Design a protein with these regions (language model features):
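Extracellular/periplasmic helix-exit of transmembrane alpha-helices
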Residues: 105-119, 163, 271-293, 353-386
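Helix-loop-helix module between adjacent transmembrane segments
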Residues: 4-28, 61-63, 98-102, 139-210, ...
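Membrane-interface loop-to-helix entry segments
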Residues: 15, 46-49, 56, 189, ...
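Loop-to-transmembrane helix boundary motifs in multi-pass membrane proteins
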Residues: 5-23, 178-187, 225-241, 245, ...
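N-terminal alpha-helical transmembrane segments of multi-pass membrane transport
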Residues: 1-128, 146, 268, 272, ...
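Flexible loop linkers connecting adjacent transmembrane helices
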Residues: 2-4, 36-42, 69-87, 111-135, ...
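Membrane-water interface regions at transmembrane-helix termini and the short interhelical loops
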Residues: 1-6, 31-45, 64-83, 132-139, ...
Length: 516
């Protein structure tokens, strides 16, 4: 890489930073008022505006289906052969689904739907049981991953057809906004993008950190306190600082690859020692229940019974995925040079879905079997100790748990460290003025944003409970939803006229491509 781009774009650096600082300070100085404010924001956006998330997500899925079957399907991201072999490319897409969040939710999400089901069903009833394992597949399924893929098509077009370097989403809005995308409106778009991604990662870290602390407590006996959570966040920041200033970025990437293999090994082990036949049978049954109820799940707002189920779960999940959509779409596009739109949309969407579905099939059904056989009582454990403790207790029932728990510790630690590192890098790129191809943002800028991400995550943990974590994603992603709409509408309007179709008939042979 050439010398670092060190000049900061003041209009992009300070506004999101000040917003985060004001919010964190207010919460720390008056936690009760902070909690009330968080609850009000969450209630307004999910109760009054929640339908917008659902309509947008379903419409986005329709756009992605259009990309698969419509006139763009055979158009290629650049005239070259694919950069990576098909097997390597699918492997990178598949491994992108491994995260601390999926380790957190996959063993236990069904329980919340079983005890407080949608559609007015009786808790713990057979009908609630069927939906309990189907709903996670919906929340982490095609509609959610399509959010990444839709904008990913646009970024692939910008990167490899138009030859543009896209570090900020405002660049992708030029097709619809014209010169305004380079002015104050463009700055506002980039600021909202930063706020959304900060909120999304804060939710992820806020989930993963207490779980990691509980694993440490189980292994070492060290009490789980806010101080332990803070220590973990500090260690992550130090590791990122060492990687940045010590030139160990390649080491971080290798750790990310190791994390993926570790996750797959853990899945294989639980699949082997757990109720394998039940896992497959219940997973297939859950798929059927999900597809049978897909449109109702997609548009369920519960205005009559007002159970809060779609607000607390469906809208939260959609908002969380939206928060990461632009940055993930950029990543997916960057590794997909030479692919057709159809190849990209199918590969990127279903590789991620298959990965997370594997986690839910194995971990979720393992827990359900434990609960059914009376090995654990989730209701009592969660009431007495909380969700992270319950998840650790689930994994503690595995044979050789004394070996498995340290493996989970390493998996969680690496997963969260790599995601903080990547998001800090993204924020540093966005806030660097006139960054050119081959240049890196300043090292201090990357480390600074890692500290900011850790600080806001700790603030949300300090408030306690799920609501602050959910509210962060819902509030932060609301503007991002409109940015995505601008990007998609502008692309369809412009690319429909300008995209060269001369490469449509070129073969997608990847035998001569490099394997990475």
């Amino acid at each position: 890489m050439s010398q670092e781009g060190k000049k900061i774009d003041q209009m992009l650096f300070w506004p999101p930073l000040l917003l985060v600082a004001i919010m964190c300070s207010a919460i720390i100085l008056n936690p009760e008022a902070g909690t009330n404010a968080v609850n009000k924001v969450f209630s307004f956006l999910t109760g009054k505006m929640g339908w917008t998330y659902e309509v947008f997500v379903l419409a986005n899925l329709g756009v992605v289906l259009y990309f698969i079957f419509g006139k763009f399907a055979n158009k290629r991201f650049g005239g070259e052969k694919p950069e990576f072999s098909t097997l390597s490319w699918l492997g990178m897409l598949f491994s992108a689904g491994t995260s601390a969040a999926i380790v957190y939710w996959s063993p236990i999400e069904f329980y919340f739907y079983l005890t407080a089901p949608p559609f007015g069903l009786e808790p713990m009833s057979p009908q609630a049981t069927a939906l309990a394992t189907a709903y996670p597949l919906f929340h982490w399924g095609p509609s959610s991953y399509a959010l990444y893929v839709g904008v990913g098509v646009v970024f692939g077009y910008l990167f490899f057809v138009q030859g543009k370097e896209v570090f900020r989403p405002s660049t992708a809005c030029e097709s619809l906004l014209g010169k305004h995308a380079s002015g104050y409106l463009g700055k506002a778009i980039d600021i909202f993008y930063m706020v959304g991604i900060i909120a999304g990662i804060s939710t992820s870290v806020g989930l993963g950190t207490p779980l990691l602390s509980e694993v440490i407590t189980k292994i070492t006996g060290i009490p789980h306190t806010l101080g332990l959570d803070a220590t973990i966040l500090i260690i992550w920041t130090v590791i990122i600082g060492i990687s940045v200033y010590g030139g160990l970025d390649k080491g971080i990437r290798r750790l990310s690859d190791f994390r993926n293999w570790l996750g797959f090994a853990l899945l294989a082990y639980v699949l082997a020692v757990g109720p394998t036949a039940f896992m497959f049978n219940n997973f297939i049954d859950s798929l059927g229940v999900m597809f049978n109820n897909y449109f109702r799940m997609s548009l369920y707002t519960d205005p009559v019974l007002k159970s809060g189920f779609p607000q607390d779960w469906t809208i939260f999940y959609f908002a969380w995925f939206i928060a990461f959509a632009l940055s993930t779409g950029i990543y997916l596009a960057r590794i997909s040079r030479g692919r057709t739109v159809r190849e990209f949309t199918i590969g990127a969407m279903f590789s991620g879905v298959i990965c997370v579905y594997t986690y839910f099939m194995v971990f979720g059904n393992y827990t359900m079997d434990l609960q059914a056989r009376g090995v654990i009582n989730l209701a009592e454990i969660i009431k007495a100790h909380g969700v992270p403790y319950a998840i650790v207790e689930i994994f503690s029932t595995l044979p050789f748990a004394s070996i498995i728990l340290p493996i989970i510790l390493v998996l969680l630690f690496i997963s969260t460290a790599t995601v903080i590192n990547s998001i800090a890098y993204t924020l540093a790129m966005v806030t660097t003025a006139q960054l050119k191809t081959g240049e890196e943002p300043a090292k201090w800028n990357r480390l600074f944003w890692a500290v900011v991400l850790g600080g806001i995550s700790l603030t949300l943990i300090f408030l306690g409970g799920m609501k602050p974590l959910q509210a962060a994603s819902v509030a932060g992603s609301f503007p991002t939803m409109f940015i995505m709409a601008i990007i998609l509408i502008g692309f369809i309007k412009k690319a429909g006229k300008e995209w060269d179709i001369s490469d449509e008939t070129k073969p997608s042979d990847s035998t001569d491509t490099k394997d990475n």
